[in-house]
């Protein structure tokens, strides 16, 4: 198994449980907790350091851009994935067809569903590329399914959308941070920052290709959307930021102060190394499940879901093992702070 040095990585975190629920929310590294505490204490003391630091937000933008392989000016920062998806939905002409996988996460689907002048069509994830047709304007999908860890054939869907002149929106919330994910082939990508990217809630990312930028209107443009934001705090803005920053929301500083050290940790370790570690743990768990007579949803992601075992989640939590119940499945998700001992503890609990 290609695992990260357990003690070196575990020392970056202070959790006291067997935490196997990154697909819901990641564990904040110690350094991220310290930054949040410093900002909160400064805000409580009524000193300027409590205002929040835009330079830190820019460093987070730069780090995320490196992780997903795009230029910094292609990244917008926000607070929630659904807000960014809403921008994309609002930009579609009436009558447009949007294709989504069956059962995908609600934030990927609902911003299109609430428009009664769009045609939203669904297809099984495994045959999504075949479902793209000449009337398809946009395919919106998660790179990795939240409920069960199934991984999309993004290259196949991209080939199909290119052939039919359709755009793609990829939600990388369950991919970025463990999967080597390249956002550059897609018109739009979104990602929540509080899962595998190890920040807190209130952090999300939107990437927009240069070619697709003019397809979107920055409907929630505030002063941070201006090219010179400090000169745009009052009155109408005179010029939007030249890049994707025009789609920024005013940052939730506590989250972005946490995101800085979290992304720095991921970059220091390397996403390839995290990928090898996380998937090795998932493989160990899958093998153990087979020995116990359980059959998980097939796949190779570090999100492993077992149909029919969702009812065990409460007892596991009482035993200090944190998992999730999703779509009738018991879902365990493994990240850089987990070890083989964590996997074995879960298996032993399921056997008992």
Where are the language model's segments positioned?
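Pyridoxal 5′-phosphate
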Residues: 1-352
């Amino acid at each position: 198994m290609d695992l990260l040095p357990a003690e070196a990585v575990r020392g970056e975190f202070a959790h006291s449980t067997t935490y196997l629920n990154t697909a819901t929310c990641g564990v904040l590294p110690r350094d991220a907790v310290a930054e949040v505490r410093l900002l909160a204490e400064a805000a409580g003391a009524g000193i300027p350091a409590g205002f929040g630091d835009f330079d830190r937000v820019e460093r987070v933008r730069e780090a995320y851009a490196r992780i997903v392989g795009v230029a910094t000016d292609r990244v917008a920062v926000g607070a929630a994935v659904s807000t960014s998806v809403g921008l994309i939905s609002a930009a579609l002409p009436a009558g447009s067809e949007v294709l989504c996988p069956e059962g995908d996460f609600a934030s990927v689907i609902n911003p299109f569903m609430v428009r009664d002048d769009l045609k939203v069509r669904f297809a099984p994830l495994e045959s999504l590329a075949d479902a793209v047709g000449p009337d398809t304007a946009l395919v919106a999908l998660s790179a990795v399914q939240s409920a069960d860890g199934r991984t999309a054939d993004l290259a196949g869907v991209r080939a199909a959308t290119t052939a039919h002149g359709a755009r793609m929106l990829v939600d990388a919330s369950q991919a970025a941070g463990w999967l080597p994910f390249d956002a550059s082939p897609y018109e739009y990508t979104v990602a929540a920052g509080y899962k595998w990217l190890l920040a807190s809630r209130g952090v999300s990312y939107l990437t927009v290709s240069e070619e697709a930028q003019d397809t979107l209107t920055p409907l929630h443009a505030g002063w941070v959307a201006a090219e010179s934001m400090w000169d745009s705090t009052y009155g109408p803005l005179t010029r939007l930021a030249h890049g994707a920053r025009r789609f920024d929301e005013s940052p939730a500083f506590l989250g972005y102060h946490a995101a800085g050290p979290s992304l720095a940790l991921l970059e220091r370790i390397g996403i390839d190394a995290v990928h090898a570690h996380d998937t090795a743990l998932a493989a160990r768990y899958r093998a153990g499940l087979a020995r116990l007579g359980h059959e998980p949803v097939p796949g190779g992601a570090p999100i492993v879901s077992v149909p029919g075992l969702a009812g065990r989640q409460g007892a596991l939590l009482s035993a200090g093992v944190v998992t999730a119940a999703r779509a009738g499945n018991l879902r365990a998700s493994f990240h850089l702070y987990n070890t083989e001992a964590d996997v074995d503890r879960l298996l032993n609990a399921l056997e008992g």
